Amino acid sequence: MSVASFFSSLPARPFGYKDGRGRTGMVSTTDIGRRMVKPPVLACRPIESNTYHGSVFLTKSSRSPSPSLSPTPTALDDEIVLDLKPFLIIYKSGRIERFLGTTVIPACPEVATKDVVIDPATGVSVRLYLPNVVDLPSKKLPVLVYFHGGGFVIENTGSPNYHNYLTLLAAKAGVLIVSINYRLAPEYPLPASYDDCMAGFNWVVSHSAGPALEPWLAQHGDFSQILLSGDSAGGNVTHYVAMRADAGVIEGVAIVHPYFLGSEPVGNEINDPANIEFHDKLWRLAAPDTEGLDDPLINPVAPGAPILAGLKCKRAVVFVAGNDFLVERGRMYYEALVKSGWGGEAELVQHEGVGHVFHLSDYSGDISVAMMTKLIAFLKGE
């Protein structure tokens, strides 16, 4: 049975929790006190996970799912329909078990962070990071809209890797960060993730002209300096949003280890057919209606894809890692952008001897420090 036909045959059942991540949904919070940022690794304690950590049921219903945990395993839970470890396993019963990207670190005043629901209908929320501005309360800060990675199927704004990394980045770069907590596949197939991220971006931009929805953005956001960034699937989303934004809104984009694929193996993909097969399955799980690996959503340089000259920003930097399975895809994207006739400034930054999103788990290594220094310089326009 194909993945798509399996999904369509499932009976309507509730998800694990409101946002489809096997945990409680985000809630709106009031403005909190701003204090000096603590070291990210000491910021907050992870929320404890339950026994069926990240497990949910698929449903065909478009309504917001009601809270429930996966029930006691049955015989159907022994039959695996799709094994995509280390990300997730889907069982015949419809239960989904995630192994990565489900731990959540709560927002807390000590690091000047908070969560805000931007769409109650979908539960989509953002996590804001405000650096210490006590001495300069009227200072306006560049606004960085960030999209997390995870292959469109795992991770969230509250995961330790992203919370700690973005806390550190906000403190060092002096930028106000808005991290988008988008819905995940397979419960919410693409284009749900794209739609949520586009909605999050538009929500940020709306503060430049409309009523003050979010005090931190209204008081401290410099909307002449809106930047986008994301890693892996978030790098893919960064490209997606920048292609569809209004002209003149985005100052720059930083695309980190982008999750781009293609039907024809390139570079180190040629000698790794197992990895190609894995990512083909993962992409088709996230996008069951896809045209395949040359779908412009996953291969922006495929024949027929929108020309990259349409990227709506002034500056772009593409980061790639030498040991990353996706390294050649990032290079190809950069080269296609430069050759497209796009009028902005582009730069390719490659780090050797490191793999995919290495910087999220190692903040103090020489290469990680060099990468953050480069990213900060880009965000500041230096």
Swiss-Prot record:
**What Enzyme Commission number(s) apply to this enzyme?**
4.2.99.22
Activation and inhibition: Inhibited by NaF, AgNO(3), HgCl(2), CuSO(4) and phenylmethylsulfonyl fluoride (PMSF).
Name the keywords, alphabetized: Chloroplast, Lyase, Plant defense, Plastid, Transit peptide
**Would I find Chloroplast among this entry's keywords?**
yes
State any single GO MF term. lyase activity
* InterPro entries recorded: AB_hydrolase_3, AB_hydrolase_fold, Carboxylest/Gibb_receptor
The UniProt pH dependence field says:
Optimum pH is 6.5-7.5.
A biological process term (GO) from this entry? defense response
Question: Does Cytoplasm count among this protein's keywords?
Answer: no
Role description: Lactone-forming carboxylesterases, specifically catalyzing intramolecular transesterification, but not hydrolysis. Involved in the biosynthesis of tulipalins, defensive chemicals that show antimicrobial activities against a broad range of strains of bacteria and fungi. Substrates are 6-tuliposide A > 6-tuliposide B.
Checking PANTHER family in the record gives: ARYLACETAMIDE DEACETYLASE, CARBOXYLESTERASE 2-RELATED
Q: What is this protein called?
A: Tuliposide A-converting enzyme 2, chloroplastic
What is the scientific name of the source organism? Tulipa gesneriana (Garden tulip)
Name the gene that codes for it: TCEA2
